[in-house]
A protein has these predicted regions:
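Short, surface-exposed "cap/lid" segments of acyl-processing enzymes
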Residues: 24-26, 30-62, 66
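Short beta-to-alpha linker loops that shape the active-site pocket of alpha/beta-hydrolase fold enzymes
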Residues: 36, 63, 68-73, 135, ...
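N-terminal cap/lid segment of alpha/beta-hydrolase-fold proteins
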Residues: 1-24
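Glycine-rich "HGGG/HGxG" loop immediately N-terminal to the catalytic nucleophile
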Residues: 67-83, 266-267
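Catalytic histidine-centered segment of alpha/beta-hydrolase-like enzymes
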Residues: 263-278
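Conserved hydrolase catalytic core segment
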Residues: 102-140
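Alpha/beta-hydrolase
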Residues: 146-245, 255-259
Length: 294
């Protein structure tokens, strides 16, 4: 039976759904971390009503915690939402890990830079990291000028590079379809339901993601990740995550890299955990965890 808890920091509390492990051998807890503009709903169920990854991995023997970033989903938003940083989310995740004990972190998209940083800063509380089309740490992102005027007219695959710092960022349906509902395996019949789950984002987080003014979240000591099982999982219909880019991320981290076409799986875009073969992908991740003794 699904329950919930509130965790996080005093400044940035977070809500997490808790899907308890099914009876049987117990494994490490899993914390599932969504990306920008999203919340944890996509790990609980798909927008077209199929079972999500959280209950799937609970059957494998994991207590699963699906966290909403501060100010997202059911996590309270503070008056400083426009100043919410990736490190703020990371510290909230670190507090949740103190509640769960050492856990495997699944991180999607913009959750990636947060997860890599948390693995470095809270090393004893992270048993492994599974990156799902994950963003890189700022070590791999060239710093862009801090002045907004320097980015006038610039875009990153369809949206402005710079987000005005004085107001939350929103996206429209065209953006949602181009950026996230872009793979041939996305459940297009449920696009409306999916679009209704998308909320505003902190402009600071977006600017950190593009390393505006060198503000991105960096790793300070990769040696702290040595020996940590890490996986980067990427599909072939995610134009902002080409094989070369995510392969370079995996190499930088010392992670395993699973380019899905290399095992005969094609058509996956950005939203791997809700696409029509999400059970197959979950099984691949479970197999990798098994290989790590997790």
């Amino acid at each position: 039976m699904k329950t919930y808890l509130y965790s996080g920091t005093a400044e940035h509390p977070v809500y997490a759904d808790v899907v308890p492990a099914m009876p049987g051998p117990r494994r490490h807890p899993i914390v599932m971390l969504h990306g920008g503009f999203h919340n944890g709903a996509g790990f609980l169920a798909t927008p077209d009503g199929r079972e999500g990854w959280a209950p799937m991995f609970a059957r494998r023997g994991h207590d699963v915690y699906v966290m909403d970033w501060p100010g997202h989903g059911r996590s309270p938003a503070g008056a400083d939402f426009v100043r919410l940083s990736m490190a703020d989310v990371g510290r909230a995740l670190g507090a949740l890990l103190q509640d769960t004990g050492p856990a495997i972190v699944f991180a999607h998209s913009a959750g990636g830079p947060i997860a890599w940083w948390v693995a470095e800063q809270y090393r004893s509380l992270v048993a492994a990291v599974v990156g799902l089309a994950p963003g890189p740490p700022a070590n791999l992102v060239p710093a862009l000028p801090a002045e907004p005027a320097a980015h006038a007219g610039a875009d990153a695959g369809g949206h402005p590079v710079y987000a005005p710092a004085d107001r939350p960022a929103f996206v429209d349906r065209a953006f949602i379809k181009a950026f996230w509902a872009n793979g041939s395996r996305f459940p297009q019949a449920a696009l409306d339901a999916y679009a209704r789950s998308i909320g505003p984002e902190s402009p600071r987080i977006l600017n950190e993601r593009f390393n505006i003014g060198g503000s991105g979240l960096r790793l300070s000591d990769r040696e702290r990740l040595r020996g940590l099982p890490m996986l980067v999982l990427t599909g072939d219909e995610d134009p902002r995550h080409p094989r070369e880019l995510d392969g370079a991320l995996a190499a930088f981290l010392g992670a395993d890299f699973l380019w899905l076409p290399s095992i005969g799986i094609s058509g996956n875009g950005h939203m791997l955990m809700i696409e029509d073969n999400h059970q197959q992908l979950a099984a691949r991740v479970a197999g990798w965890l098994g290989e790590q003794g997790l």
